Amino acid sequence: MPKYEIMTILDPKAEMAIIDNLLKTVFGDNSTEKLRKLETTNLAYPIRKSKIAQYFLVDLNAPTNLIEEFVRRANITREIWRYLIVNLDSEKGLNKKPKIRERNRKYTPRRDRFEKPNFRGNPKSRFDQQDQQATKNQQNFQQNQQNQTSQYRENSRQNQDDFQQVSSNQQNFGQNQQNQSGYHRENNRQNQENIHQNSKNHQNQTSQTQRNRRQYQPIKNPKFNQKEKENYNNKKPQSSN
C-alpha cells in the first residue's frame, strides 16, 4: 500500500477537529496518530483576504480510492482552503530535511558572458527607477519631436515642388496661348492681304476688259468719214475662221 503525506491549510478561525474528523471518516481512526500542526502561519499570498492560516501535516498509508475520496470531501469543506498530497514512494515528502552537506552546499549557476550581472545586494530604489523612466520618456518625446519636424520639412519641400510645377505649367500654357494667338493674327493678316490683292487684281482685270471693249467697239457715229472708218476697221483684229 503506498505511503502518502498530506498537508492542509485551514482557516485561522477553524478548529483542529475539522481535519481530524475528516481523516477519521475517510482513512479510519488510526489515521490521525501522526497528525500535527506546523508552526508556520504566514501565507505566500492572501487567501480570502487573509494573510495567515493553519498548517496541518499527516503521514499515512492508504489506497488510491481513499485518496480520491479525501480530495472530494476536502473540496466541499469550506474551512479547508488548500491541500497538497505527496506520494512518498515516488517523491520526496515535505517533512524530510536535506542533509547537512546538501543544505550548506552553494550552487552558483554559470552566467553567460553576454548576460548582465544581477546585483541583488544593491537593489535600485523606487526614486531611481522613476528617474530612469522619466529620462526614457523625455528621450522618446524628443525623438518624436525630431521625427515630426523632419516629416514637416519633407512635406513643405514637397508642397513647394508641387507649387513650382503648377506655376511652370501655367506659364507654359500662357506661352502656348500667346503663340497660338500670334499665329492666328498672322494668318488673318495674310488672308486679308491675299483677299485685298485678289480684289485689286480682279478690279484691274475688270478695268482692262472694259478698256478693251471700248477700244474695239465699232464706231457708229455718222460724223466720222469713210476714211477714218476704214482705218479703224483695219486696226481691229481679224477673227479666225
Curated annotation (Swiss-Prot):
It holds the Pfam family Ribosomal_S6. Gene3D superfamilies: 3.30.70.60. Keywords: Ribonucleoprotein, Ribosomal protein, RNA-binding, rRNA-binding. Residues 130-151, 161-182 have a biased composition (Low complexity). GO terms for molecular function: rRNA binding; structural constituent of ribosome. The keyword Hydrolase does not apply. Belongs to the bacterial ribosomal protein bS6 family. This is Small ribosomal subunit protein bS6.
